[in-house]
Design a protein with these regions (language model features):
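Alpha-helical hinge/cap motifs
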Residues: 12-13, 121, 210
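A structural signal for short, well-ordered beta-strand segments and their strand-loop junctions
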Residues: 4-7, 28-34, 80-83, 115-120, ...
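PAPS-dependent sulfotransferase catalytic domain
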Residues: 84-181, 189-205
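C-terminal accessory extensions appended to soluble enzyme cores
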Residues: 202-214
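PAPS-dependent sulfotransferase catalytic core
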Residues: 1-75
Length: 214
C-alpha cells in the first residue's frame, strides 16, 4: 500500500505526511517519505528518496522531467508516503511554457499509489489563513507566544482573498478530475484526533501514544 497526499498548500499536508509516516513505521511497517514528487527525487538501489546533495538548489528542483519522475516511480521498490502540491504543477507549467504533459504522470500515480489522501479545509478559513500570512509574512506559528501575538485585528487584501478562494476551487476540480481512490482528510478533524484519523486511513489498530507513552 502506497499513499499519495494531495494539497493546494496550507491545509496541513506536511503534518499529515510526517504523522502518517511515523504512524506506519511505529506500526512495524517500513515506509519512506521522499516528500514532494515534483521538485527533486533520486533512486538508489531501487529506493526512491528525496534528492539531497551538495549541488541541490532551487534552479535544480524542476529540472527532472515528468518522464524521468514517472520512470523512478515505476522502478521504486520501497513503500511510499509522497505528496503532490498543485502549485508545483502550476510553476512547472510556467517554467516549461506549458509544454509538459501530465496525463501519463497522473496515470502512473494512480497505479503506483493505492490510496490518495485529499487534504480539505473550509474554503473561507483557507483563504483567510493565506490572507493573514500575506499580511504578516508569517507562514506558521510555533509556540503559544506567537499565537497570542497574532490576536489582533487587521485589514486583509480582498483581491488576494478572492484569488485564494479561486485557487482552492481549482484544486478541488484538479483532484477529482485526475485521481482515483480518494480519501478526504479534513484539516480540523485531523488536528483534533490524529491517531483516530490515521487509524481510519490505514485500518491499523495502532496508536502512536502507546509507542511513546505520551
Amino acid at each position: 500500500m502506497n499513499y499519495l497526499i494531495l494539497t493546494p498548500d496550507g491545509v496541513g499536508s506536511t503534518y499529515l505526511q510526517r504523522a502518517l509516516t511515523v504512524y506506519l513505521n511505529c506500526a512495524g511497517k517500513d515506509y519512506y517519505n521522499p516528500h514532494e514528487l515534483l521538485n527533486g527525487l533520486q533512486l538508489k538501489n531501487d529506493i526512491l528518496l528525496r534528492k539531497q546533495d551538495a549541488s541541490y538548489n532551487w534552479l535544480y528542483e524542476y529540472s527532472q522531467t515528468v518522464e524521468n519522475i514517472c520512470s523512478m516511480l515505476q522502478q521504486a521498490k520501497n513503500k511510499l508516503v509522497c505528496r503532490i502540491a498543485k502549485y508545483h504543477i502550476t510553476r512547472r507549467l510556467q517554467q516549461y511554457d506549458h509544454t509538459e504533459d501530465y496525463e501519463k504522470f497522473y496515470q502512473v500515480c494512480n497505479k503506483v499509489f493505492d490510496k490518495k489522501l485529499f487534504c480539505t479545509r473550509d474554503p473561507f478559513e483557507y483563504a483567510m489563513s493565506w490572507s493573514i500570512r500575506n499580511k504578516t509574512d508569517m507562514l506558521n506559528m510555533y509556540n503559544v507566544k506567537e499565537r497570542k501575538d497574532m490576536h489582533f485585528s487587521m485589514d486583509v487584501d480582498v483581491n488576494f482573498f478572492k484569488q485564494k478562494l479561486s485557487e482552492y476551487g481549482a484544486y478541488e476540480f484538479w483532484v477529482k478530475d485526475n485521481f482515483t481512490n480518494l480519501v478526504a482528510v479534513d484539516y480540523d478533524k485531523f488536528h483534533y484526533n490524529p491517531d483516530n484519523e490515521l487509524h481510519n486511513i490505514t485500518g491499523y489498530e495502532h496508536a502512536v501514544t502507546s509507542k511513546f507513552d505520551i
